[in-house]
């Protein structure tokens, strides 16, 4: 198991949930956190603990974002007109690495970040190597022609455990994904419940 894979599954164990719905998650075999004290029964969380956990789960889901990265996205969600929690989800789903993951071009959000950083992705025909790049409605994201036969891409396209959401129009023959619209929370195919409203409560008090 690579360090990246180990870190990913550590997030699952820390959250106590198989947050990406992966068949290989250790949470499919045991239901306790990492470390020597992981098997201790957890008590009921306080309001603060529940809010913190909701924030950590979202940060982890999108590739274990740093607090600085996540706080910056949240601050923008606050500035935009509308519900802050919904805005937060929309901004996270507009990240280029998230689009690559949702389109099933790669198997994990961690692989998506690395894939973008290594220059395998184009947006509207121009190479973009910034995972946090924010796509707009109508943008066409594609895998560069020289990268389309990579094993990681071919294997991911065939994965049965994930479906492509309807806010993307994906052509796996041409390896393109059009970002149709910014999704609402209910549109996003999370494997577990995400609660951005609790994230809003967390930052309102801290």
Curated annotation (Swiss-Prot):
One of its GO terms (cellular component) is small ribosomal subunit. InterPro entries: Ribosomal_uS4, Ribosomal_uS4_bac-type, Ribosomal_uS4_CS, Ribosomal_uS4_N, S4_RNA-bd, S4_RNA-bd_sf. One of its GO terms (biological process) is translation. The keyword Transport does not apply. Residues 94-157 form the S4 RNA-binding domain. One of its GO terms (molecular function) is structural constituent of ribosome. SUPFAM superfamilies: Alpha-L RNA-binding motif (SSF55174). It comes from the Bacteria. Residues 23-47 are annotated as: Disordered. Keywords: Ribonucleoprotein, Ribosomal protein, RNA-binding, rRNA-binding. Gene3D superfamilies: Ribosomal Protein S4 Delta 41, Chain A, domain 1, RNA-binding S4 domain. Part of the 30S ribosomal subunit. Contacts protein S5. The interaction surface between S4 and S5 is involved in control of translational fidelity. One of the primary rRNA binding proteins, it binds directly to 16S rRNA where it nucleates assembly of the body of the 30S subunit. With S5 and S12 plays an important role in translational accuracy. PANTHER family: 30S 40S RIBOSOMAL PROTEIN (PTHR11831), SMALL RIBOSOMAL SUBUNIT PROTEIN US4M (PTHR11831:SF4). Belongs to the universal ribosomal protein uS4 family. This is Small ribosomal subunit protein uS4. The lineage of its organism: Bacteria, Pseudomonadati, Pseudomonadota, Alphaproteobacteria, Rhodobacterales. The gene is rpsD.
């Amino acid at each position: 198991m690579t360090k990246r894979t180990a870190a990913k599954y550590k997030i699952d164990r820390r959250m106590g949930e198989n947050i990406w719905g992966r068949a290989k998650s250790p949470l499919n075999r045991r239901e306790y956190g990492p470390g020597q004290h992981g098997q201790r029964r957890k008590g009921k969380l306080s309001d603060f603990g529940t809010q913190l956990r909701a924030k950590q789960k979202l940060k982890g889901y999108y590739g274990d974002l740093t607090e600085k990265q996540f706080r910056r996205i949240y601050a923008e969600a606050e500035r935009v007109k509308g519900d802050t929690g919904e805005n937060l989800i929309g901004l996270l789903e507009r990240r280029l690495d998230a689009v690559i993951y949702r389109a099933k071009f790669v198997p994990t959000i961690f692989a998506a970040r690395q894939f973008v950083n290594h220059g395998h992705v184009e947006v509207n025909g121009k190479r973009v190597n910034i995972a946090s790049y924010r796509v707009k409605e109508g943008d066409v994201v594609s895998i560069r022609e020289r990268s389309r036969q990579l094993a990681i891409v071919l294997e991911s396209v065939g994965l049965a455990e994930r479906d492509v959401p309807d806010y993307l129009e994906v052509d796996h023959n041409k390896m393109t994904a059009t970002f149709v619209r910014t999704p609402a929370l209910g549109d996003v195919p999370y494997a577990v419940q995400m609660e951005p409203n609790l994230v809003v409560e967390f930052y309102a008090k801290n």
